[in-house]
Amino acid sequence: MHPMLNIAIRAIRKGGNIIVQNYDTQKFIKEDLDKKKIFIKNIMYKTYRIISEVIYKSYPNHIILNKNTDLIKNEKNTLWIINELDGKNNFIKNFPHFCISIAVIMKNNTEISVIYDPIRNDLFTAVKGQGSQLNGYRIRCNNINSLNYSTIAINLPLKHYAKSLFYLKIYKKLILSGISLRCTGSTLLDLAYVASGRIDCLFDFNPQSINLIAGKLQAREAGCLTSKFTENSEKKSEKGNFCTSNLTSSSKFMRLITEKISQCYSFNN
């Protein structure tokens, strides 16, 4: 096992213990939502701190960043990117679907990824060039070339709904094609699920690169491709639309999806 992967696993499991302990505790909090958010913020801080302590103990000269930090190119230093809680709203609502992630970047390349679901005890790991694993077993994405009966996850922040009904038109096109849609509230877990074949595809309408670095390596090492699903870049809302799919032997799946969404753009214009 890669020595940095070993440290990342040790750190993320310790962080997961804090998340689980407080997940059970916060069920009994009766304060208003604002106070509960402060409680969650404190949990995230503790999680980030314990993960950082484990990493610094072995690699005191490395740089550790969290998901709110702007990622800059750094050829000299090794960077550790921590997302201490992806799926925060699920956690607040006691919906057990969230995760922690660590990504290790060396010479501007993501080399190691760990995603941990502390509730299910699912540990997704990936090392560049060595594939992806779930709980120590090699995983690969599904090999499909049809939209029928496929399951697609969607990441769309609520703020986009208020601006346009355009996304609802996309949903309609996809549903009529026989697709089952999911909006789970944790894009990182969605990427891990695409990598492991639990989900066939992810549409990300609001990608935040530093948040999803770990998930993208997981998907890529499992045989997935990530690409833009529209060529139109005139509107800001369209610039960040990406599709990660389990496209392993045929481009038919991507072509069909692109065709459906292109129809929506034409109709919208």
Curated annotation (Swiss-Prot):
Substrate binds at L85, D86, G87, K88. Signal peptide: none annotated. Its main location: cytoplasm. It catalyses: a myo-inositol phosphate + H2O = myo-inositol + phosphate. GO terms for cellular component: cytoplasm. It holds the Pfam family Inositol_P. GO terms for molecular function: inositol monophosphate 1-phosphatase activity; RNA binding. One of its GO terms (biological process) is transcription antitermination. Its cofactor is Mg(2+). Keywords: Chaperone, Cytoplasm, Hydrolase, Ribosome biogenesis, RNA-binding, Transcription, Transcription antitermination, Transcription regulation. It is found in: Cytoplasm. It comes from the Bacteria. InterPro entries: IMPase (IPR033942), Inositol_monophosphatase-like (IPR000760). Its EC number is 3.1.3.25. It is an enzyme of class 3 (hydrolase). Homodimer. The rRNA transcription and antitermination complex (rrnTAC) consists of RNA polymerase (RNAP), NusA, NusB, NusE (rpsJ), NusG, SubB, ribosomal protein S4, DNA and precursor rRNA; S4 is more flexible than other subunits. Belongs to the inositol monophosphatase superfamily. Part of the processive rRNA transcription and antitermination complex (rrnTAC). The complex forms an RNA-chaperone ring around the RNA exit tunnel of RNA polymerase (RNAP). It supports rapid transcription and antitermination of rRNA operons, cotranscriptional rRNA folding, and annealing of distal rRNA regions to allow correct ribosome biogenesis. This subunit may play a central role in organizing the structure. This is Nus factor SuhB. The gene is suhB.
